[in-house]
Regions:
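Conserved N-terminal substructure of TIR/SEFIR domains
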Residues: 1-64, 83-92, 99, 120-141
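Secondary-structure boundary/capping motif
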Residues: 14-16, 43, 71-74, 105
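Conserved TIR/SEFIR loop-to-helix hotspot centered on a Trp-containing motif
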Residues: 67-88
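Short secondary-structure boundary/capping segments
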Residues: 86-87, 104-106
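Conserved beta-strand scaffold positions in the cores of enzyme catalytic domains, especially
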Residues: 94-96, 113-115
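Short, polar loop motifs at secondary-structure junctions
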Residues: 98-104
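Residues that scaffold the ATP/ADP-binding catalytic core of kinase and kinase-like folds
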Residues: 107, 116
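Eukaryotic intrinsically disordered, low-complexity regulatory regions enriched in Ser/Thr/Pro
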Residues: 109-111
Length: 141
């Protein structure tokens, strides 16, 4: 794998600015290789192929959950691709953080996610997220 994590998020505010201005820099400061679309998608390539490349070449996909995330077909595709790869390899590929309260689809609700709805929760849970992202995808038992 080339990347530690592919970040799946909505570009619109407040999600995009928080991901690009807070989350990604802090993950990179922790030494993680982060695949984020605005920096890693190749110009001129079809978006769907670049999404698939990001998911396939990353050990984990991190879904940044919010009401806006749930309305996007693109973010749904990214999370479904990660779930599918995880099922194929019996690995834990899809992780999630809750940025804004929302009710994700069942496949994501069935997973434990980290609360990052406030600055205090970000400070408390970011070290755990970094630790999880550093760990191998791992076989699900």
């Amino acid at each position: 794998m080339v990347w530690d994590v592919f970040v799946s998020y909505r570009h619109q505010a407040p999600d995009g600015p928080w991901v690009r201005g807070v989350l990604v820099p802090r993950l990179q400061e922790a030494g993680l290789a982060v695949f984020v679309d605005v920096d890693s998608f190749r110009l001129g390539m079809p978006l769907v192929l670049e999404m698939a490349r990001g998911v396939e070449q990353s050990r984990h996909t991190l879904a940044v959950l919010s009401p806006a995330y749930l309305t996007s077909n693109f973010t749904e595709l990214e999370s479904v691709l990660a779930e599918h790869l995880g099922l194929e390899a019996s690995e834990r590929r899809l992780l999630a953080v809750m940025r804004e309260p929302c009710r994700p689809r069942l496949g994501i609700r069935a997973r434990l996610w980290l609360d990052m709805t406030t600055d205090e929760e970000v400070a408390r849970n970011l070290p755990r997220l970094v630790e999880e992202l550093r760990a191998p995808s791992g076989v699900v038992s």
